[in-house]
Design a protein with these regions (language model features):
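Pre-active-site segment of Zn-dependent metallo-hydrolases
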Residues: 2-3, 28-71, 82-86, 137-143, ...
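Metallo-beta-lactamase
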Residues: 2-8, 66-77, 91-162, 227, 247-264
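Conserved beta-strand hairpin/beta-sheet module of binuclear metal-dependent hydrolase folds
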Residues: 6-59, 147-168, 188
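Structural motif
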Residues: 28-30, 67-68, 93, 127, ...
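Conserved catalytic scaffold of divalent metal-dependent phosphoesterases
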Residues: 31-39, 111-119, 126-137, 187-199
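Active-site environment of divalent metal-dependent phosphoester hydrolases
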Residues: 37-39, 74-80, 101-104, 115-118, ...
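Cap/insert and terminal regions of metallo-dependent hydrolase folds
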Residues: 99, 171-263
Length: 264
């Protein structure tokens, strides 16, 4: 096996439901947006805002060591729930938005767009995690962020390692194009999908994260070898699921790139 070949070896990604996925990269164990609560309702100011409809496929006790949490944002329970907040206390480093880093305190670091941090690998060497744009709704960031808040995506790179993109709650293909210009080809894209909408509440019911067709388009833009979709099940506000993802990627001729995590 040549060194070039090793960069395309497929590493497993375990998907727990919602936006939560676990993978090992350069010897470090990374977890995206931790959500391990049981099904139930979430309230704000006495109003129900979200409903979780299914339990995770495993518990936080199943995780083993977690070195880094990649947290796209801390303000919404479908990205960081009550059990997820408890978990953060035991994780050495949480990377998140600049505002989230200030809210979460000592073990959290916020990354602005294109800001990078280098992390030591257990066997020597380093990986680089770069914060990348994510817009949690339709339109320009300056119009969206005051309503849905800051969100950050992540790109992971390292010598001899595949490039990995974690989109976070992003609805903008223009943001994906910016990321592709800097980092393509991406080996593995963990794409948040599900076509979440809040008709009559947010943005006239427009998408606040990619739908399935857009996820397939994002895969094409990124030139990615593999897409691991997350954030498409277990919550009532997700309007598209597994079947829509498979259909969209099949229509786009990309279904062979879709990794639904059936073998966990």
């Amino acid at each position: 096996v040549t060194s070039a070949d090793t960069t395309t070896e497929q590493f497993p990604v375990r998907v727990f439901g919602g936006p939560t996925a676990l993978f090992e990269y350069g010897g470090l164990r990374l977890l995206t947006d931790p959500t391990f609560d049981a099904p139930g309702d979430y309230y704000e100011s006495g109003q129900r805002i979200l409903t979780k409809t299914a339990p995770p496929s495993g518990s936080s006790a199943d995780l083993g060591r977690i070195d880094v949490v990649l947290l796209s944002h801390d303000e919404h329970p479908d990205n960081l729930d009550n059990s997820g907040r408890v978990l953060l206390a035991d994780v050495p480093l949480t990377l998140t938005t600049p505002e989230g880093g200030r809210r979460l305190g000592n073990r959290a670091k916020g990354l602005a767009d294109w800001e990078s941090i280098e992390l030591d690998r257990p066997g020597g060497g380093r990986i680089t995690v770069t914060g990348v744009p994510a817009i949690h709704g339709p339109g320009a960031r300056e119009d969206v962020e005051p309503i849905t808040g800051q969100v950050v995506g992540f790109v992971l790179t390292g010598e001899g390692l595949p490039t990995v993109y974690v989109s976070g709650d992003n609805a903008s293909l223009d943001a994906v194009k910016e990321i592709a210009e800097r980092f393509e080809p991406v080996d593995t894209a963990i794409l948040f999908a599900g076509a979440p909408r809040f008709p009559g509440v947010l943005f006239d019911g427009a998408l606040i994260v990619l739908d399935s067709v857009q996820a397939a388009e994002a895969a094409e833009i990124l030139g990615t070898r593999r897409v691991v979709p997350v954030h498409y099940d277990s919550w009532a506000h997700f309007t598209e699921g597994r079947n829509e993802l498979v259909a969209a990627f099949t229509t786009a001729g990309l279904v062979d790139r879709l990794d639904l995590g059936d073998e966990r």
